[in-house]
Amino acid sequence: MALRGFCSADGSDPLWDWNVTWYTSNPDFTKCFQNTVLVWVPCFYLWACFPFYFLYLSRHDRGYIQMTLLNKTKTALGFLLWIVCWADLFYSFWERSRGIFLAPVFLVSPTLLGITMLLATFLIQLERRKGVQSSGIMLTFWLVALLCALAILRSKIMTALKEDVQVDLFRDMTFYVYFSLVLIQLVLSCFSDRSPLFSETIHDPNPCPESSASFLSRITFWWITGLIVRGYRQPLEGSDLWSLNKEDTSEQVVPVLVKNWKKECAKTRKQPVKVVYSSKDPAQPKDSSKVDANEEVEALIVKSPQKEWNPSLFKVLYKTFGPYFLMSFFFKAIHDLMMFSGPEILKLLINFVNDTKAPDWQGYFYTALLFVAACLQTLVLHQYFHICFVSGMRIKTAVIGAVYRKALVITNAARKSSTVGEIVNLMSVDAQRFMDLATYINMIWSAPLQVILALYLLWRNLGPPILAGVAVMVLMVPVNAVMAMKTKTYQVAHMKSKDNRIKLMNEILNGIKVLKLYAWELAFKDKVLAIRQEELKVLKKSAYLAAVGTFTWVCTPFLVALCTFAVYVTIDKNNVLDAQKAFVSLALFNILRFPLNILPMVISSIVQASVSLKRLRIFLSHEELEPDSIERRPVKDGGDTNSITVRNATFTWARSDPPTLNGITFSIPEGALVAVVGQVGCGKSSLLSALLAEMDKVEGHVALKGSVAYVPQQAWIQNDSLQENILFGCQLEEPYYRSVIQACALLPDLEILPSGDRTEIGEKGVNLSGGQKQRVSLARAVYCNADIYLFDDPLSAVDAHVGKHIFENVIGPKGMLKNKTRILVTHSMSYLPQVDVIIVMSGGKISEMGSYQELLARDGAFAEFLRTYASAEQEQDPEDNGVTGVSGPGKEAKQMENGMLVTDSAGKQLQRQLSSSSSYSGDVSRQHNSTAELQKDGAKKEETWKLMEADKAQTGQVKLSVYWDYMKAIGLFISFLSIFLFICNHVAALASNYWLSLWTDDPIVNGTQEHTKVRLSVYGALGISQGIAVFGYSMAVSIGGILASRCLHVDLLHSILRSPMSFFERTPSGNLVNRFSKELDTVDSMIPEVIKMFMGSLFNVIGACIVILLATPIAAIIIPPLGLIYFFVQRFYVASSRQLKRLESVSRSPVYSHFNETLLGVSVIRAFEEQERFIHQSDLKVDENQKAYYPSIVANRWLAVRLECVGNCIVLFAALFAVISRHSLSAGLVGLSVSYSLQVTTYLNWLVRMSSEMETNIVAVERLKEYSETEKEAPWQIQETAPPSNWPQVGRVEFRNYCLRYREDLDFVLRHINVTINGGEKVGIVGRTGAGKSSLTLGLFRINESAEGEIIIDGINIARIGLHDLRFKITIIPQDPVLFSGSLRMNLDPFSQYSDEEVWTSLELAHLKGFVSALPDKLDHECAEGGENLSVGQRQLVCLARALLRKTKILVLDEATAAVDLETDDLIQSTIRTQFEDCTVLTIAHRLNTIMDYTRVIVLDKGEIQEYGAPSDLLQQRGLFYNMARDAGLV
């Protein structure tokens, strides 16, 4: 050899000698090999890594690490190693100078090693300067150097022990020093250095230890052990969780996706970049078909007419996350190659057992090789998984962030096509699909690679017969393809049904109070169940398909093996199936099983993700609002004195619709107060929306000068403290804040709220009255100190005296905003004389414009309307003249001059009380208000008072009762049948493999085996029986899962609908939506699959242990201890894993709640230009959720590494005992034992993963059961006490000593109410805010049950009858008109009790017949979500039509005509008088004018009746009622 002269002077030392290294009982390497290869390998490794590592470090500077003792020691040791290496070199030169001839290797190797040690020392310092705390490159270098040195050390020790060998003392001593220093360097490299200077983790109160963990800690996931130990000792809480790594936060991830999406959109459309997330330009070109886009969202699967216009979201995701994700390719490729080391070593091991002359050390060497290969495979595999899961987490974060940002800027038309339910599904289900895909997508190339490698090795082992197996696999490809296509179809249908169900559930939860008041729960329950039935039909088809899929996937590897063995033994009698061929092939078939099984799952996952990808792309491509359509000028712009200029502008809500506003032209000077008036639906609110750029400008010019504040018609309140709602992101300036509170009449409210302005308002302002919500909304606008104020009827929901106070102190000529430009949409005529300009709207156009006096002098439509209406009212109600004390036209004129129109018609001035407590939800606050007033000493104002309950995480182990509940939901027969079929399957599998081992041990006679046909037939029969059992259990589990899912959903839905209102008032809707979306999806899709995999893994592990014990009984010594370690590690892990899953579920709800809240208030957020703040809040909530998710995925890896090490130990001992017992074992048993042990690692890993998955997913059942077992309201029907069908006939209502409280720990909000209302009487209920007005109504409907006393209606105590029996017989027209998506007819008559004629009659009486008749679909007109395609006034009229249709003896009105114009108001009042003439009418009135002609009035204060009598009598008493009338300007 060429190296002989290089290694020794006489050429006697070869590089390699088989007789020295292999064919010997005492193996060693040659001296030449030791001095060259073992020295050069670490050097070549470091020099090969250096250029790439240097480049990486130069681009990734994490900061500067100060010199530490660790760093100084490593550097010093590096120099010492250099000195030691070159000491050898100088010694060689010294020897040469003495005439001793040395081979060149003694000069080259020390030189190379010395330079390498200098390089290593340089890298140690470079890493320090670049902030690397622990280096994998250097640790690997020292490990390789040590392993190479270890082989040399063994050789030197063995040489030294020989007596007749001469020892080179100096070189031996330097080597021992070198070995010791390398060992110390390796140990030091296992530790991590301190954090770099200026590192962000220094300022983080709870940083993730991963960034400062050592390389060894990172690859073994040791750094999370502390958290797992803490979780084992006590349940983990949110405060225990670490901050996210910076690269995983929304702040880092989302902007990159946003930027790449913009580029892709621009590139695809071949036009300038359209900003998708920053509300600059529309996402689609103006000439694109918006209708097509909407249809696509609805159908989800229709093809785009112009494919070239569709940007590729997949490309964007790949560009954003690809670079990091590509590392997983590297790890996966290494793992796939290493997978085949097991069967190859198994072949060597079987050959070793068969070769009785082979030295024992070879068996131990193979055993060690098998163990090391398995351990390396474990570490590589879980680095791969870690990268995949982190990538998935980042994708989910980015998708949620992108969807949230898009939702802030899409047009109103796009909002209608993408409902809240669909958008929530994009954030929950679809984002989860991307996460799942990240884990599996590499299998697209990895599975075929594994199949090719396995087939290659099988060909080497068995030859051409393997083609029979290939044929079977090829036949299965079209079967899998058909199933994948079918799966996609079912997936699309399933997602559509799920969207519809979530959308409807969202509406039900938002309008639950209305459902309860109308007793409509059953109708809507049936609607949900009908959608759910369709969903379950699709799920059932998917389950059958999955069962067929499982059957083919499990049977395919066996069929491949059977066909291959059958062809092998039949084509040639001399082909003997010995242990090596059978079990190496079987090991390869087992490897083949995974890619063949996983590929259909991957295809399914890709199919699901492609559906989600399309849905997401359609949503992100929606049209956006164009804020640039309105010119925004700074206040300092002195060129124009007008604050608002609109010239010939036309606006529409959707480009496909006709314009809503036509030819609008007006200018408003700075500081002017402008009123906008007109009938319902004439475009008043649309005008404000147009100024806010909420509408699509078709033509014209709009310019605004300065900042804008907006008070919407329906007050939007956040689930936050009252103070935060007012500040709305601004800094607190105490004096100004106090003046705003006072001007908005909130001071009295702060005094009675439990924690003052720190009181948490609750979701949608649940514990504030309508008036309080509107005043908070107003205060928010005032506090922001804008230049232009847009008020959409802000005084509608407040009492007359409060309205007067607000107008005088805030909006009016002398108010806080007197120098600001104000536009006030109003129906109240009383304020018009004080405004500068009045804009009169009619049919989407400005019909008149001018000051109050100018419009009267012009004698146009406006003046005619005022005169006609006033005189008509006077003629209608002459008795009111006596009340007010003045009569005739003179009075009207005088009041007009004074700016107050206070005749009875003025009393019925149109106010919109839309915001007043979402269908009475605000009355909880009235309870708290009066309670606090009665118990002022009880309120602790230091702490924020909270009404809403956060989603709580359960702690501890999931109770067995949860599993039992799930089994009962499946059905006990199906449950036990599934277990039986699982056992049958695995018994058949064990029997077939044992039979194969017996077959391989059959004696060979004349070059062939006897009984081959019998062996083959039995082997085939066992395989077929296994397949039948697989199909059986798969069907049983799938059907059982659907039965359980149906049962749990019905229980949850029924329970939620049966819960009292107090439950909804304290439970955020996000929690409930989460249950019906994510948790139910887990029960639908995840749990059945997890059960199948858990049961399979459990029986596989048991089977493997049985086989190993049968083959090598000595393994009984080691398997129990390993089992204990396994059990301990698993218990250790599950305690933390379970709690992390719960924390993740709990932190997910606020993401949805915040998102829902944002969608409801998106116009306010945009008006105040607070998008960035809300985006930041959303990002923080998503990060908070990922803070719990990230440790859970790392904990999974932590567990898997440790358990696979236990599995690797089983492999080690199975092989070791086989080597020890090789003389007493047959090759067949060794093959069976080791091939099963090779699978144990995978089985153990899957078993623990599936057991933890089972426990973490069963949490979904626990969380569904949690809300299925909440408190319930009284029964809906009680047969024994059901009232007669014609009850109540008279309508007499008696309150006898009636007391009401909202919770046991609170005081009464109604105290000892004793009053009798005779049938047919019209009774008004008045009182200040918090007096208990609405509480009385809630008591009447038994929304809250009485604490003491009773209510008697026509002689029947209402507490003794069913709630529906009561609520069907009483009708309410609520303050807030709530409509549901569906037909108009359904909104009027969900039970279809009435004929079309009766419905049309009710519409006619409600003055809606003309409007509905003009609609294309008439009664089948589809109402949008929340009735958004009807004006607020029209929605209120629909509520009136409901009441007219029901025509019950008792009618409750809560300012029912607040949102209609004066003319319609008059018509409605007369309808109520005529149609409900013989009915008992109770009216809660903020405005006393509406009840002046009533029979009697109840005056409430602090929950007690203070006055009761006819209005005229109460005025004469000059008490509370008189004072209220005086404040309202009635006396």
Swiss-Prot record:
GO cellular component: basolateral plasma membrane
Modified residues (Phosphoserine): S289, S905, S915, S930
Residue stretches making up the ABC transporter domain: 644-868, 1293-1527
Stretches of the chain found on the membrane's Cytoplasmic side: 55-74, 122-133, 194-316, 385-440, 486-547, 612-967, 1047-1089, 1133-1203, 1248-1531
Chain positions recorded as ATP 1 binding sites: G678, Q679, V680, G681, C682, G683, K684, S685
EC number(s) given by UniProt: 7.6.2.2, 7.6.2.3
Record field: transmembrane: 34-54, 75-95, 101-121, 134-154, 173-193, 317-337, 364-384, 441-461, 465-485, 548-568, 591-611, 968-988, 1026-1046, 1090-1110, 1112-1132, 1204-1224, 1227-1247
Glycan-modified residues: N19, N1006
Keyword Ribonucleoprotein: no
InterPro entries noted in UniProt: AAA+_ATPase (IPR003593), ABC1_TM_dom (IPR011527), ABC1_TM_sf (IPR036640), ABC_transporter-like_ATP-bd (IPR003439), ABC_transporter-like_CS (IPR017871), ABC_transporter_C-like (IPR050173), MRP (IPR005292), P-loop_NTPase (IPR027417)
NCBIfam families the UniProt entry points to: MRP_assoc_pro (TIGR00957)
Protein name, as recorded: Multidrug resistance-associated protein 1
Species of origin: Macaca fascicularis
